[in-house]
Amino acid sequence: MRIALFFSAMLVCLGAVAAPNEPATLDRSTWPEQLISPALFDVASRAEILAFAHALLVSETLDESALKQRLGLKTINLDTIDNLRKRMWQRLLANYNLAQQSCDQDASFCYYVDGMDSLREQAGKFEIADDSFYVAWAEPSREFHQRYLDEQLRKAALFPQISSEIELFGEQESNGEAMHDRLFSLTFDSGPSQLPGTTDWLTDYLRKQSMSATFFVLGNSAQVRLDKSGTQALQALYKGQCVGVQGWEYRSHSHWQDWQDSILRTTALVKQVIPNNYVALFRPPYGQRRADSGGFFQAQGLQVSLWDIDAQDMSASLSAEQSAQRVLSLMLLWRHGVIAFHDTQDKVRTALPWLLKATAQSGLGWEDCEVL
């Protein structure tokens, strides 16, 4: 198996891979079954878990030089990469065990796994036969998981010099890793949009679906809305939703001299104008914040709210449907978590309805925003 993994790693390094700025996506039409039951969700989940575990195992055969080459970086933080890999393996094992609970209904991709060693063994020999019912999915999935893994490894390699959602700095920070199985939370960044815009459509759509989400607003955008439409209109916009803060401007809060004022001004504005919707959460743009900021957030009673599943809907290289397909693939892989969209992007008008339709019969839950 070691020899096979070595050659797999060599092919990864020598083969053409997408540029770091091109996010991974997976055409879900290559998967031959609709997710019309919890059991079929589990079948697809087991497949994505094993495919990603195989990619993760292959990456561990690369030495530091080869890993730098693969990630396109001159220096990398190996400690953070190792920590990320360990966390990923732990989540994969837990998720595979959860996905195995429906094997009595459909045994596809059900293998004997009683611990980490056996999971790694199954990942090492995981492959799809040429005559398999799932053969059309095999190669697109392999490419997706390699590219997605590289996204995550690259963030870990740069951490903490460039902070991101890949790691937590302390107890004042959270993501969705502790959420229950099959439970997801919707969040939207960088709004509100210009009037009228996607934010208006989105909050109305969510209310019609009897759903709620957390909107992380920018102070300057909220102020523009307030000046144009007034307090009552802004309150009506976010009726039934939760509103956190993302700072006054959409820029990194890790090296900005006025980062504290940015957060304080935005928090004061939201508390004053839409106090009933305010939740004490800060979402750092790009996930970038200072390593020593925990004391500030604690003093302000704020929790740093990160995410697990990035829709990458701001990327010009992804269409709305590709963004939704990326999210669904990662929902199958991680089985729970916080999903991050941007309500300033028109793509969400297509992506969110597509996602809800694709998962409507999968036995998933959408967490109320006040619980996040």
What are these regions (language model features)?
Residues 2-186, 197, 204-213, 335-372:
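Terminal accessory/targeting
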Residues 20-47, 291, 296-334:
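Active-site-adjacent pocket scaffolds in enzyme catalytic domains
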Residues 51, 83, 87, 94, ...:
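Charged/polar, solvent-exposed surface patches and flexible loops
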Residues 116, 120-122, 128, 132-136, ...:
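Metal-dependent polysaccharide deacetylase catalytic core of the NodB/CE4 family, i.e.
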Residues 144, 232-233, 322, 326:
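Exposed alpha-helical structural elements
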Residues 160-177, 197, 253-271, 325-327:
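Short, composition-biased local secondary-structure segments
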Residues 189-190:
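Alpha-helical, coiled-coil/dimerization segments enriched in small aliphatic residues
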